[in-house]
Regions:
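A helix-coil-helix interface module used to build multimeric assemblies
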Residues: 1-201, 206-212, 274-275, 286, ...
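Charged, flexible cofactor/metal-binding loops and thiol motifs
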Residues: 121, 128, 143, 151, ...
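A generic structural-conservation signal
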Residues: 53-54, 151, 221, 382, ...
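Short runs of predominantly hydrophobic/aromatic residues within well-ordered alpha helices
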Residues: 37, 84, 88, 234-237, ...
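Generic, well-ordered alpha-helical scaffold segments in large soluble proteins
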Residues: 40, 61-68, 90, 94, ...
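Conserved hydrophobic residue
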Residues: 49-50, 74, 263-264, 379, ...
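Short, well-ordered beta-strand elements within core beta-sheets of diverse protein domains
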Residues: 40-50, 119, 166, 235-243, ...
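Glycine-rich cofactor/substrate-binding loops
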Residues: 1-36, 97-98, 279-444
Length: 444
């Protein structure tokens, strides 16, 4: 059953009908559509637009549809234009003409806006749950490796020694901010658009605040035109998903590097690796590569919706139907990535001796030599220059800083004493950095 057609003299072409239909993808809004319709009917009964008996029968019909969809007895199929048409058609088939009163005081414009807010809100809560699982894995990893030393990098060159706990603490902070962004977005999206109608409200005495409260919203939206014509809450959510994807991708990039033969910092579980069809020795980090690759897909969905919305005049335009496929794809993709990342990380092993030996190379304790000289009374800028000369000397001699003799050190500064060797050991370099947020603050 079509929800329109009275002013048309010809049937819509079959190709155009297929082009216009959204049921194949918006059918996943079925539960939200029913939830919104039930709240709408309760309100219509309360304000007297429907009698108590009418409201009760319609609610029973909607509850029956929900139950049958959940059990699989009713399948979402057929030639309905969208999920709203499908639900209303089934309702009319089941309870007769009374079902035609369901849509009183409502447009599909505010109906779909409501469905999407309900769906996105629920998906955001689920996403936070998967983030929490990943954070729990990271926190467990940090506790286990508080004193396990690894090289820290800038410009992909060894810079200073740090710990595994400190390194992953950076990702913990990123994902905590991601969680905070989701919570903030949920607050902004948590307003009910139902009752906005096509864009200009309705002449029926609707109680929009009742519906908002019934559905767990903070309140009803303030402007009926804005309610149906913007998708900023959805764009913001896709941005949040893109930000999470970016953080996941950065972590995956490091996992891919660390897993390579040249780094050899970690061992990935066989459960989260794949092989080669031609090279029998290969053990590839495909899960990490896929998460990294899917980030571009999530970004693309965000920019697709931004581009769709950028030129639309107020109020509703059918272009906005394009919001769903990109949104659903990003939601599904990101949740999948979070689940895989948590399990992959939880099963990953660190090659601790390899990490420690790597941290010794590349003069990563050079800053600590400079700090040592400063504590002996040398200005930092002078110390910086002296240590630069020391590093150049080491490169020519094929030595590391801790391999220099005291006599060699004193060629560059008379301030150097025997205690230099304790000051520049890996443990000292890490645990003496105790300022808030530094690796030494996690050592004890």
């Amino acid at each position: 059953m079509k929800l329109w057609g009275g002013r048309f003299t010809e049937n819509v072409d079959e190709l155009a009908q297929a082009f216009n239909a959204s049921l194949p993808f918006d059918k996943r809004l079925a539960m939200e559509d029913l939830e919104g319709s039930l709240a709408h009917v309760k309100m219509l009964s309360k304000v007297g637009v429907l009698t108590e008996e009418e409201g009760r029968k319609i609610q029973e019909g909607l509850e029956g549809i929900r139950k049958d969809l959940q059990s699989g007895k009713l399948l979402i199929e057929g030639d309905a234009e969208d999920i709203h048409s499908f639900v209303e058609t089934v309702l009319i088939q089941r309870i007769g003409e009374l079902g035609k009163k369901l849509h009183t005081g409502r447009s599909r414009n505010d109906q779909v806006a409501l469905d999407m807010r309900l769906y996105v809100r629920r998906n955001s809560e689920e996403c936070r749950g998967y983030l929490e699982e990943l954070l729990a894995v990271i926190e467990k990893l940090m506790e286990k490796h508080r004193r396990d030393i690894m090289p820290g990098f800038t410009h992909l060159q060894k810079a200073q020694p740090t710990t595994i706990a400190h390194h992953f603490g950076a990702y913990k902070e990123m994902f905590l901010r991601d969680r905070s962004r989701l919570l903030d977005g949920e607050k902004r999206m948590n307003f009910s658009p139902l009752g906005a109608g096509a864009f200009g409200g309705t002449t029926y005495p609707l109680d929009r605040e009742m519906v908002a409260k019934e559905l767990g919203f903070t309140a009803a939206t303030e402007n009926s035109m804005d309610s149906v014509s913007d998708r900023d809450y959805l764009i913001e959510y896709l941005f949040c998903l893109s930000m999470i994807s970016m953080h996941l991708s950065r972590l995956c990039e490091e996992i891919i590097l660390w897993n390579s033969n040249d780094y050899g910092y970690i061992r990935l579980s066989d459960k989260y690796s794949t092989g080669s069809s031609i090279m029998p020795q290969k053990k590839n980090p495909d899960m990490a590569e896929l998460i990294r690759g899917k980030t571009g897909r999530v970004y693309g969905n965000l920019f697709s919706l931004l581009t769709t919305m950028k030129g639309l005049p107020l109020a509703y335009n059918k272009d906005m139907q394009e919001d769903k496929e990109v949104a659903f794809d990003s939601m599904d993709t990101l949740q999948f990535c979070l689940r895989v990342m948590a399990k992959m990380l939880d099963s990953m092993e660190f090659r601790l001796e390899r990490l420690r030996e790597s941290a010794k190379k590349g003069f990563s304790n050079a800053t600590d030599v400079a700090d040592y000289l400063v504590k002996k009374g040398m200005p930092f800028r002078t110390a910086h220059g002296v240590v630069g000369e020391l590093v150049l000397y080491c490169e020519k001699e094929g030595k590391d800083l801790e391999e220099l003799s005291l006599e060699e050190y004193r060629k560059f500064s008379d301030l150097v004493e025997e205690d230099i060797y304790d000051a520049i050991s890996l443990e000292s370099c890490v645990k003496n950095r105790k300022t808030k947020g530094a690796p030494g603050s996690l050592w004890d």
